[in-house]
């Protein structure tokens, strides 16, 4: 739906160029249902991850700090999801006021940037820990990790400011309903292009290239170590995991990014056909479901590969309190890529297998 704005009242009155685009009865049922499932699984899962990492693992590793913040970022988004489920179920009628319109929209944007930035930092941390285990010890400290997370939250907040400023409620005259959307001046294309392309570039393309490069270099390093030892009985799970992480990230986010770019073209009136607009508006909520279902699974995807996490997760389920005496043993095996190869395998850098630990 492409809005045209007509007055300067408290609640702006708009005219939608393609009023029926994206408005299908099955969307009003399917999307809220999926949102509800994501909300339940995400709140439950990410809350458990936060409790296990903070209370049982005690933030003893750099990776644990990134994973904790990743779970917190997802929780920030998830608490706004019931609003979007209700909004869709009510056929895009927004009854929650202008303030919640801004905050809920900012929550989506904030989670996008915070999660992607944290995943990028986690991939860089894995690269440093595995490829440069000795040189990176000085840089990979708990203090640096905490400062990095603070910077990421600030950057995500700054990136979300345009959403807070320009997202408002409007009354769509030809739809006879109040909607939550962006207001674009007809002659100002900078904001339209900027918001869309920043999501494409900063929220996907650049982080993905960094993640892909990091895990590719990790894969080459581990492969070289195996080739030197000629160990035919090696375990290739680490290679499969690296490939899975990259492809899972890419294929979960690429649909939403493509349709975001098409939406920019619609806002710029490069695409004016209402049939194409209907396709974009119809597909957009489903691409959001795919993207954020991936985000909610990220903590599980990374953490459940850690041996210690499974133990503490079971303790939490059985209401067994954390054992303080076990804390010193938690400095390793935190993240999904903290990998310890067989003892007879050494990296070409002449470091022992212990250099694969997460510290």
Swiss-Prot record:
GO terms for cellular component: external side of plasma membrane. Angiotensin II binds at residues 17, 167, 182, 184, 199. Its main location: membrane. It comes from the Eukaryota. It is a multi-pass membrane protein. It is found in: Cell membrane. Residues 1-25, 90-98, 166-190, 269-278 are extracellular. The chain crosses the membrane at residues 26-55, 62-89, 99-125, 142-165, 191-216, 240-268, 279-304. GO terms for molecular function: angiotensin type I receptor activity; angiotensin type II receptor activity; C-C chemokine binding; C-C chemokine receptor activity. Residues 56-61, 126-141, 217-239, 305-359 are cytoplasmic. PANTHER family: CELL ADHESION MOLECULE (PTHR10489), TYPE-1 ANGIOTENSIN II RECEPTOR A (PTHR10489:SF956). Receptor for angiotensin II, a vasoconstricting peptide, which acts as a key regulator of blood pressure and sodium retention by the kidney. The activated receptor in turn couples to G-alpha proteins G(q) (GNAQ, GNA11, GNA14 or GNA15) and thus activates phospholipase C and increases the cytosolic Ca(2+) concentrations, which in turn triggers cellular responses such as stimulation of protein kinase C. This is Type-1 angiotensin II receptor. It comes from Meleagris gallopavo (Wild turkey). The lineage of its organism: Eukaryota, Metazoa, Chordata, Craniata, Vertebrata. The gene is AGTR1.
């Amino acid at each position: 739906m492409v809005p045209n704005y007509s007055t300067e009242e408290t609640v702006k009155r708009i005219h939608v160029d393609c009023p029926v685009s994206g408005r299908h009865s099955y969307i009003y049922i399917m999307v809220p249902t999926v949102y509800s499932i994501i909300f339940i699984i995400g709140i439950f899962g990410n809350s458990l991850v936060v409790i296990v990492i903070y209370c049982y693992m005690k933030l003893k590793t750099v990776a644990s700090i990134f994973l904790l913040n990743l779970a917190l970022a997802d929780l920030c988004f998830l608490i706004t999801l019931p609003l979007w489920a209700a909004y869709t179920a009510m056929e895009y009628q927004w009854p929650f006021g202008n303030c919640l319109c801004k905050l809920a929209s900012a929550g989506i944007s904030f989670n996008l940037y915070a999660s992607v930035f944290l995943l990028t930092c986690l991939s860089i941390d894995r690269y440093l820990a595995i490829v440069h285990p000795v040189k990176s010890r000085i840089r990979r400290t708990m203090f640096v990790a905490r400062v990095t997370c603070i910077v990421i939250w600030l950057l995500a907040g700054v990136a979300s400011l345009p959403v807070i400023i320009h997202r408002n409620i409007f009354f769509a005259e030809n739809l006879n309903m109040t909607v939550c959307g962006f207001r674009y001046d007809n002659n100002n294309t900078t904001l339209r292009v900027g918001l869309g392309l920043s999501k494409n570039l900063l929220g996907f393309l650049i982080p993905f290239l960094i993640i892909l490069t990091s895990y590719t270099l990790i894969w080459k390093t581990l492969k070289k170590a195996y080739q030197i030892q000629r160990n035919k009985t090696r375990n290739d799970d680490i290679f499969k995991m690296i490939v899975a992480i990259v492809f899972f990230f890419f294929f979960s986010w690429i649909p939403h990014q493509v349709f975001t770019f098409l939406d920019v073209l619609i806002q710029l009136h490069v695409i004016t056909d209402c049939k194409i607009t209907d396709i974009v508006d119809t597909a957009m909520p489903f691409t959001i479901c795919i993207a954020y279902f991936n985000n909610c699974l990220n903590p599980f995807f990374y953490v459940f590969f850690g041996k210690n996490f499974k133990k503490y997760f079971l303790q939490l389920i059985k209401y067994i309190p954390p054992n303080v005496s076990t804390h010193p043993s938690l400095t390793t095996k935190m993240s999904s890529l903290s990998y310890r190869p067989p003892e007879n395998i050494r990296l070409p850098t002449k470091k022992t297998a212990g250099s694969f630990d997460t510290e």
